[in-house]
Amino acid sequence: MNKSKEAETDITQIFPNLDILPKKFSAKELAERRIKKLHVAPGSIFMNRWSIEGVIGNGGYGQIFMVMDVKKNDERAMKIEPKLRAEVITKRMIMEQQVLMKMQGKTHIPTMYASGFNDQFNFIIMQLLSMNVGDFRKRSPLGRLSKETVGRIAYQTLNALKDIHDMGYVHRDVKPANICFGVHAQNRHILYLLDFGLVRRFKTESGVCIPWRINAGFKGTERYVSVRVHEKLEQTPWDDAFSVLYTAYELVVGELPWRYLEDIHEIHGVKKLMNEVTKNGEMFKDIASILVDFHKMILECDPVVELPYEKLLECLKCLYSPKSLLEPYDWEDGYKTTLNI
C-alpha cells in the first residue's frame, strides 16, 4: 500500500457528498459530554509542529484531536493520555506505542508519525482515519449494515488480528469503536484496527507460549468479550475471534441479544446460552443466521491451539461473495444496499 503524499487523493474529491471523517465536537457538545479539561487547546501549536484543529474523540483513557502537520500541510490524528490517573502512572499508551512501532508496515495498522510524552501526558501522532464502523451503523436508516459490508468488515478485521497474533499479541478489545477505514481514495476500502492499550503477549518472540495465570482478571469491553473472559481465563486469539463474531452480529442485526442488560453475570449467562448450539436458534434467526457457521466454527476450535485462519476467512468470504473488498461499502452508496435487505 503506497502511503506517499503524492499518492493520496482526498476521497471527497471523488465522492463530494461523502462525510466519513470523525466529527469535531463543538464547545456545547464538549460541555454536554462533561469534558472539563482539554490537555491541549484548539488553535494552539503542539511541539512547534502540530496545529490543534479540534477534538474528535474522548474516552475514559484520553482524548483524540485532529491536528495539522504545519510542515507538510497534512491532517493527522493525535491521541493523548494523562501520565497520571488517580495518582498512579498510566501505562496503557506506552504499551500502545510499543505495539504500533512493531506493527508498522502491516496493511491494517495505522501509520504512526510520532510518539512521546511531556510533563502532562503521553501522545501518539497517527494517520487520520474515518469515523468508526459503529458510527457508520448508527447512521444507517435501519440502524444496521448489509451482510456484504459486515462480511468484509469481519474478514478484514480477522486478517488484521492474524498479523497481531503472529507477532505474539492478543488485542483484547476488538469492537466496532476500534475499527475504521482510510479517508483517501487509495485506502478508503482498507480497514484499520485501533487501540492497542489492552494488548498482551500470549507467546514470546521465539513463539513459545507464555504460561497462563490462574486468575487473568477481566480485560476488555463487557459487550464484546467471550465467555472465557467473563470466567477470567487467560485470553488467546480464540477470544479475539469471538469479539469479531459479536462485532459482526451487532453491525448486521443492529444490537446484541444482551444490549439492554446491565448485570455482567446476566450478560455472561446469555452468551453461554448462545454457545449451546441446540439452543441458539432464537439468537441466530433472520439476518443473524448468516453468522451461524462462523460461530460454530469458532466453537469447534481449541482456545489453546492456533486458529484455522484460512478456514475462518473462507467462511466470512461467503457473506459478501460475489462482491470484492474493493467495491463500495454501505456508507458510500447512501445505504441503498442496507435498505434492499
UniProtKB/Swiss-Prot annotation:
The keyword Lipid biosynthesis does not apply. PROSITE patterns: PROTEIN_KINASE_ATP, PROTEIN_KINASE_DOM, PROTEIN_KINASE_ST. One of its GO terms (molecular function) is protein serine kinase activity. InterPro entries: CK1_Ser-Thr_kinase (IPR050235), Kinase-like_dom_sf (IPR011009), Prot_kinase_dom (IPR000719), Protein_kinase_ATP_BS (IPR017441), Ser/Thr_kinase_AS (IPR008271). One of its GO terms (biological process) is signal transduction. The active site is at 173 (proton acceptor). Signal peptide: none annotated. GO terms for cellular component: cytoplasm; nucleus. Residues 50-326 form the Protein kinase domain. ATP binds at residues 56-64, 79. It catalyses: L-seryl-[protein] + ATP = O-phospho-L-seryl-[protein] + ADP + H(+); L-threonyl-[protein] + ATP = O-phospho-L-threonyl-[protein] + ADP + H(+). The keyword Cell cycle does not apply. Gene3D superfamilies: Transferase(Phosphotransferase) domain 1. It comes from the Eukaryota. Its EC number is 2.7.11.1. Keywords: ATP-binding, Kinase, Nucleotide-binding, Serine/threonine-protein kinase, Transferase. Belongs to the protein kinase superfamily. CK1 Ser/Thr protein kinase family. Casein kinase I subfamily. This is Putative casein kinase I C03C10.2. The lineage of its organism: Eukaryota, Metazoa, Ecdysozoa, Nematoda, Chromadorea.
